């Protein structure tokens, strides 16, 4: 089965096309991205602006046509914190549905955490024992822990890299005092959640997912993406501390020149590093292993499982749409190929 997964994040919209079947390894066929910075397209009342919504709708419409031309049987479309937290999220979702035919759903933070954990568990298998997973997005930090495929603990905290950059580190480069203040604030914010997580049990394996963690690992010496997903990559607490001291003195333009840091992520990588550092400190983790699978893969796996046993894809909700029901004619296949990024 060929599936399309449309991920509307705080910074980017990402379409992943995969060939997948139950019991098999989902095979990525193409990846298409657009940088919208949706989290920044909000007004003083917390609403996504008309311009931001218009850009989102245009991008989703384009990507839905790419999914059709790629031969996808279904398109699973979901949004994370930028849409979820917006005051007018329902209005935006309604516009997307009416103008594109795509049923975009704002995932609950807990579902985001659970689906990511499912992907991590499937990647490492049962022999990994208790897994603790950290995932830093633009708007939130997800923390999950468990010994099964369903985590015992699944938290979503408003500690995303983009959110904290806007709220705490407006200067470029950020001032030392602001960095120190954010460190102290993060320690306080993570004190109670970390107790909840550790009470469930100490992890046998600490894992991290998300582009933020992959970039941080690369900056501290992990293998580049071209080495493939099965190469072991780790991020240590000591390496992270040294990295923060280095990148916090750089401008966003200079950080964007570093290998592993894209131009759209460069402004928020310092805040992301501080969240990673504080999370590892609060949970007494000295190193995390970087998992190449995350939320998108978790959604694909849950989709395949739900078709086999007849359960709901996500409790009380659905995030899939028949691509054939999407309005508009299939896009020109060559145009779709030209707009695709490199394979993950």
Swiss-Prot record:
Keywords: Hydrolase, Manganese. It catalyses: [phosphate](n) + H2O = [phosphate](n-1) + phosphate + H(+). Exopolyphosphatase activity is inhibited by (p)ppGpp alarmones produced during the bacterial stringent response. It comes from the Bacteria. It is an enzyme of class 3 (hydrolase). One of its GO terms (molecular function) is exopolyphosphatase activity. Belongs to the GppA/Ppx family. Homodimer. This is Exopolyphosphatase 1. The lineage of its organism: Bacteria, Bacillati, Actinomycetota, Actinomycetes, Mycobacteriales. The gene is ppx1.
